[in-house]
Amino acid sequence: MFKSRFLPVLLVIAALVSGCDAPVLDISEPSHHEKTSARRALDSVSIPPPRRIPASEMQKTIERVEGPIRKAAFEVCRELTLPDVRCQNVLASDLQVMATDQDMNAYADYHNNVGFTGGMIHYSGSDEELAAVYAHELAHVMYGHVDKKINNMLMGMIIGGGIGLAAAYNADPYYDDRITYDLMNTGAAIGSVAYSPEMEIESDRTAIYILEKAGYSPDSMRDVIVRLHRHQDGAIGGHPNGVGFLQTHPSNDRRIAHILSSIDDVKSGVPLRLE
């Protein structure tokens, strides 16, 4: 049983837990029926074959979508009245291509830069699919998702360390200091994935609005997720690489359900709303 003088530490830990960064969009959870329909879409939607773009053409290919998507992402950021520094980060973000990396992946890093692997470009079915991925990653930039994940990781580390100190206080002199170290690492690991699926859904939804503003088909967001799902299962080109773009992401049926709902909203004129 914790001693009463340790109560302030527990209150601090509770405050840190409640302070973890969460998504900011107002997004309803899809129904069971919508998830079932989404599951069917993963297997039945027709998508174009992979273009198998050579490494020498990758930079030029991605640059075709860079300007329109970056401009549209900045406009969406301003319309959402997000902090100006976030919108400026969208304009300042570098776009990098790792042509020799054959995994299908893309990411936004803690410098607010966006990277594409060669596999993502090589296996894409259209420029619009690449535009969808780029819009998704710029949405991460505008929401500051990488910073939020780092903050959540640090909070998790502090919480884990606090639990370890509490145990040490009550177990002394028999406590092993390695337990506190392990708890800090565990807390950091848990914090680093806190809200990750929701942040991905938030970026997917925002990307669809960016695509529409840039003049691309909102359906391309659906198509690229279907392609990634099938590639992950080894259904494209017999090359079953792991798909980093799907790691820490929501389940495919849940993700597609949100995407289909967002596409309907865009086509119906429903605005993007913050909570």
For each feature predicted by the language model, list its residue ranges:
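Extracytoplasmic and endomembrane cell-envelope/extracellular-matrix remodeling and assembly machinery
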Residues: 28-31, 204, 209, 217-275
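Extracytoplasmic/secreted proteins, especially bacterial periplasmic and envelope-associated proteins
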Residues: 57-64, 68, 115, 125, ...
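Peri-catalytic and regulatory segments of divalent metal-dependent proteins
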Residues: 21-154, 213-214, 233-240, 272-275
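Cleavable N-terminal export/targeting peptides
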Residues: 11-14
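Metalloprotease/metallohydrolase-associated module, dominated by Zn2+-dependent proteases
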Residues: 171-220
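Post-HEXXH active-site segment of zinc metalloproteases
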Residues: 146-181
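Bacterial N-terminal signal peptides that target proteins for export
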Residues: 1-9
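C-terminal motif of bacterial Sec signal peptides marking the signal peptidase cleavage site
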Residues: 16-19
